[in-house]
Amino acid sequence: RLDQYAFICQEMNDLMAQGVRNVIEMTNRYMGRNAQFMLDVMHETGINVVACTGYYQDAFFPQHVATRSVQELAQEMVDEIDQGIDGTELKAGIIAEIGSSEGKITPLEEKVFIAAALAHNQTGRPISTHTSFSTMGLEQLALLQAHGVDLSRVTVGHCDLKDNLDNILKMIDLG
């Protein structure tokens, strides 16, 4: 948790002692991300924290996801990549964790996936997705691919929570 500074610093020091130099922090906007906390941990421990930008899934979206355009949502992500997060010098290095609901991609989730694709196409940053109970991974990839994303730059999260080896192999074949 991002409220346990001493504990996290010790964990990062332990990782550094094992040769780890980079960690990816997948807590995105409106899910408790704390850019200054990450910067403080980086400065204290020397580890590099790769922060993310994006929106999680429909049930967790802030209201403005419904009212802003795809282009505006994409620009917010690009700004966090190019300019920094929450007024800090910490810049997002990955577009994540872009999620879908169990068994469906809602219209707002589709909007966010398209915005993530636009941000990826503009910045080249990789995308990491969230599947709910291993559903919709293939559909996520199809949506991203339809909007010009190089699928070798995408990871599909939590796709192994059900016995669906055929789907996993299909996703691997896509990139």
Label the predicted regions.
Residues 1-9, 27-30, 62, 101-107:
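Divalent metal-binding segments
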Residues 1-3, 53-71:
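Active-site gating loops and adjacent loop-to-helix segments of metal-dependent hydrolytic enzymes
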Residues 9, 13-14, 21, 34-38, ...:
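Histidine/acidic residue-rich metal-binding segments in metalloenzymes
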Residues 24, 31-35, 58-61:
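Short active-site-adjacent helix-start/loop capping segments
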Residues 24-26, 50-52, 156-158:
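Active-site neighborhood of phospho(di)ester-bond hydrolases with catalytic His/Asp-centered motifs
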Residues 29-30, 56, 134:
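Conserved beta-strand edge residues that scaffold enzyme active sites
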